[in-house]
Amino acid sequence: MTKKYSLGFVGRKAGMSRVFTEDGRSIPVTLIEATPNRIAQIKTVETDGYSAVQVTVGARRAALVNKPEAGHFAKAKVEAGRGLWEFRVEDAQLGDFAVGGEVKADIFEVGQIVDVQGVTKGKGFQGTIKRHNFRMGDATHGNSLSHRAPGSLGQRQTPGRVFPGKKMSGHMGAVQQSTQNLEVVKVDVERGLIAVRGAVPGAAGGDVIVRPASKA
């Protein structure tokens, strides 16, 4: 089956709130700052081997922009943003975009189902109980050392090693994660806001990518 590509949008998580329906029900929503994305490059099959739209958003001090990036932004005649993001699109869609143009929040509509991708909150080094939902050992009844110990890591001299992927203590969080099939509750282009039903990954102030749902 051929995968269909569609344009997404880069925003910033503002926090959570709630909205009320006409019949008085409360809906929890995440508010996403949706300032216009500036198009920095159009990639085509002829020049790059695939079709894509590259965008930037926000602002970055000139001192923090290296020379290759500065040249890239200057060529597109757009202000340097806080990063570059790329969205694969269908070949037929490229005619709708131009370098230096903008992509706004109105590419989404109320009721649409979307996927939101972000970087989860970092939790630092954590044990197996918090990181992998292991069960604790007994608090008493002869247990004096292994209340939160993970237990056995393997077998004996055969195979004589710990298998890759074994669930152990380690760094938790700060990974890229997607939450799928969230409903768009409100789109406010003038104020630059998108409200989606439910929670999205990451802390307030973190960049998030909103895309049409891949499995809806």
From Swiss-Prot:
Indicate where the modification N5-methylglutamine is found in the sequence: Q157
Instruction: List GO molecular-function terms, semicolon-separated.
Output: rRNA binding; structural constituent of ribosome
Q: Where is the signal peptide?
A: none
What does the UniProt keyword field contain?
Answer: Methylation, Ribonucleoprotein, Ribosomal protein, RNA-binding, rRNA-binding
Q: How is it modified after translation?
A: Methylated by PrmB.
| GO CC entries | cytosolic large ribosomal subunit
- Give the record's GO biological process terms: translation
Among its keywords, does the record have Nucleus? Answer: no
InterPro entries reported in the protein's UniProt record: Ribosomal_uL3 (IPR000597), Ribosomal_uL3_bac/org-type (IPR019927), Ribosomal_uL3_CS (IPR019926), Transl_B-barrel_sf (IPR009000)
Q: Which domain of life is it from?
A: Bacteria
Q: Which Gene3D superfamilies match?
A: 3.30.160.810, Translation factors
The record's function comment reads: One of the primary rRNA binding proteins, it binds directly near the 3'-end of the 23S rRNA, where it nucleates assembly of the 50S subunit.
The entry sums up its family as follows: Belongs to the universal ribosomal protein uL3 family.
| PANTHER family found in the cross-reference section | 50S RIBOSOMAL PROTEIN L3, LARGE RIBOSOMAL SUBUNIT PROTEIN UL3C
Subunit structure, as described in the record = Part of the 50S ribosomal subunit. Forms a cluster with proteins L14 and L19.
Protein name as catalogued: Large ribosomal subunit protein uL3
Organism of this sequence: Stenotrophomonas maltophilia (strain K279a)
